Amino acid sequence: MATLLQEILTNNHEFLVNNKCTKEISKYPQKKFALLTCMDTRLVELINKALGIHRGDAKIIQNAGTSLIGEMGETVKSLLLTIYVFDIKEIFIVGHYDCGVALTSSKDILHNMRSRGVSEQQLKLIEKDFQVWLDPYTDPAKNVLTVIKKLKANPFIPNDIPIHGLIIDPHTGKLDLLEDGYKEI
């Protein structure tokens, strides 16, 4: 029985044989926008198709719950890189309905970590971080609007960057507009 790693390497070999990527694509996004969205498995391929994004169009940042924790967390740093190095001109925040993060609590994940052998001493070090991150998140649409508010308040995000908020149905790909960033500029 092949392992998942072997399957992936075989798929890559077949991809290289059958798909000649001869066109050089710039690392600078052609449509000059960044997309922050969730890492949910149902969004793989779906979000690109639903938004009409093709290889080379955008900088895509994915994390659990389309999260933004702290003024200078990793997600913000990634967005700043897209603005100041890769010259993006717009940001799209796209959450999704039925988000697993909204159904998870710090208590749940800490319990699961404990059952997998993480010591109480180690859990105490991260408990507050998980409470701050997971416990307030109960509504994906509200989260998108909160992320936009935090980005607009961030002194390092230029005021001339429209920040749009949408939410996608992970089953159909239908987008609902939550905030039109053009109306804010």
Predicted segments, located by residue:
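Structural motif
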Residues: 32-34, 58-59, 89-92, 164-165
